[in-house]
């Protein structure tokens, strides 16, 4: 072991056997990440819990009694944080976690294993919310990567655009959308879409996001409500 620049003991992973360099680097980073260690101590399922915590500590959009939807929720770090803040474990709000993957139970969280891209998903969600809309739709999804940077950026932006479209179908007027994005030149359409549908749109980089990552979050507040489709003029 050696100390890093902050004085903490640093664990070094020795390469051996058939471990790939990428796997070694990932494991080395995990073992030396203070947020990973803190998540274990605090009982969170992922370090991502601190990203949502930091964003909400600054902007205060999670409130007691809200209806919240967590897209791509597994393993559940964001759901854990949101459930505490809205009080859903004590019956003061409702949190619906959606993912294609299975997710272990979390107090105060209702899990739905489904594809939010399915055309029936918005109606299914509203049914789970008792016929009402959501106050907050949040997403920490990143999707699968190919290793080809431009392709991955387009895929990620496409996923967030789909999440934003889903949010526009289920949010109440005044609602909030928060989602992970990656800094690139491919998100102009997404930002235009959000600025059209929300009163305020901003980018946020919480301290828990690794400094060497292009990861950041888009926070859109004040949903304007679904705009009615323009009607064609009738012939006299």
Curated annotation (Swiss-Prot):
SUPFAM superfamilies: S-adenosyl-L-methionine-dependent methyltransferases. It is found in: Cytoplasm. The active site is at 180 (proton acceptor). Its EC number is 2.1.1.166. InterPro entries: RNA_methyltr_RlmE, RNA_MeTrfase_FtsJ_dom, rRNA-MeTfrase_E, SAM-dependent_MTases_sf. It holds the Pfam family FtsJ. GO terms for molecular function: rRNA (uridine-2'-O-)-methyltransferase activity. S-adenosyl-L-methionine binds at residues 76, 78, 99, 115, 140. One of its GO terms (cellular component) is cytoplasm. It catalyses: uridine(2552) in 23S rRNA + S-adenosyl-L-methionine = 2'-O-methyluridine(2552) in 23S rRNA + S-adenosyl-L-homocysteine + H(+). Keywords: Cytoplasm, Methyltransferase, rRNA processing, S-adenosyl-L-methionine, Transferase. Belongs to the class I-like SAM-binding methyltransferase superfamily. RNA methyltransferase RlmE family. This is Ribosomal RNA large subunit methyltransferase E.
